[in-house]
Amino acid sequence: MASSFPIYELTSNGDVVLTLRFTRLRVSSAILSTASPVFREMFGPNFLVGQNLYSPRNPKEIPLPEDDSNAMMRLCYLLHHQRDPSDSSPLNVSSTQGAKEFLTMAELADKYGCSHSVNMVSAEPLSYFADPSAINAGTSIEALLHLIAAMYVLDDRRQFARFTG
């Protein structure tokens, strides 16, 4: 049952609850609509989901069981300019696992059409890894390959060129 899953409140005036496989996220439809044309359509009048008015008192639950819970959580925290309190570094991509999770989030951003928003936030932290000395600093080749794939998925041509140049 979805209600037994934890709910993460990204904003106190969230009017939508995204119900994922293992968690629920209370988010702002306005923020997601601004960042994503897919969410804009989903929350608009042409979809059943968007035909009812939302309110923070009675947030609308939207099931997204096919999306990766961790990736959607990271993406929503990023779009809401919030930091997951349980995660010391939301863009910790120096480990192979962190880079793989970033790639999964990038694929989700691509799915929802908000790659540009991720690019703006991730450019500075990722620029460190475009330097060849990153390999000497302990970043694995596998982690770098995940990051290169993420830059490709995000259509971040500048970072992709830096990573592969």
Regions found by a protein language model. Name each.
Residues 54-62, 66-74:
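Eukaryotic helix-linker segments that join adjacent hydrophobic helices
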Residues 77-165:
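Post-BTB helical module
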Residues 33-43:
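Short active-site loop/helix that positions an aromatic residue
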